[in-house]
């Protein structure tokens, strides 16, 4: 079986400030990795052949200054969160917080990685590689 695969990764520090719950901010993905039959748009992937895809993502958040902050993150398809990808965490003041997921979902159109605020929060992604988004087609070609 031929697989489609595409990865984006981010390697620079990004800052996010949320003032209320329900705010959405896209994670910037500035480096492309090898791909096959998947388009590369700024900060998103373009799915050319609809089908079932394995989605893997990871976001590394640097320790925050203010305790008891929470955040959600996940993958969006055509601007809407894919529910099965949403992860939620309290942000650590001493260690890196990692939000990650791996699911299989039907994809078409564009996908990206984004935060969904659960309350007020201020955070930075870690230095170096701090976010990845990979999709790989798992359904057979017809």
Region spans (language model):
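Extracellular jelly-roll beta-sandwich "head" domains, especially the C-terminal globular C1q domain
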Residues: 1-142
């Amino acid at each position: 079986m031929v697989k489609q695969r595409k990865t984006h990764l981010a390697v620079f520090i990004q800052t996010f400030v949320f003032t209320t719950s329900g705010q959405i901010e896209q994670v910037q993905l500035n480096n492309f990795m090898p791909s096959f039959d998947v388009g590369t748009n700024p900060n998103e992937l373009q799915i050319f052949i609809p089908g079932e895809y394995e989605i893997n993502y990871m976001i590394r958040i640097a320790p925050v200054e203010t305790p008891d902050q929470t955040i959600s993150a996940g993958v969006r398809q055509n601007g809407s969160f894919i529910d099965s990808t949403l992860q939620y965490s309290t942000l650590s003041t001493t260690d890196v917080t990692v939000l990650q997921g791996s699911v299989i979902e039907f994809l078409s159109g564009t996908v990206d990685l984004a935060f969904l605020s659960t309350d007020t929060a201020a955070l930075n992604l870690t230095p170096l590689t701090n976010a990845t988004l990979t999709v790989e087609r798992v359904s057979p070609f017809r």
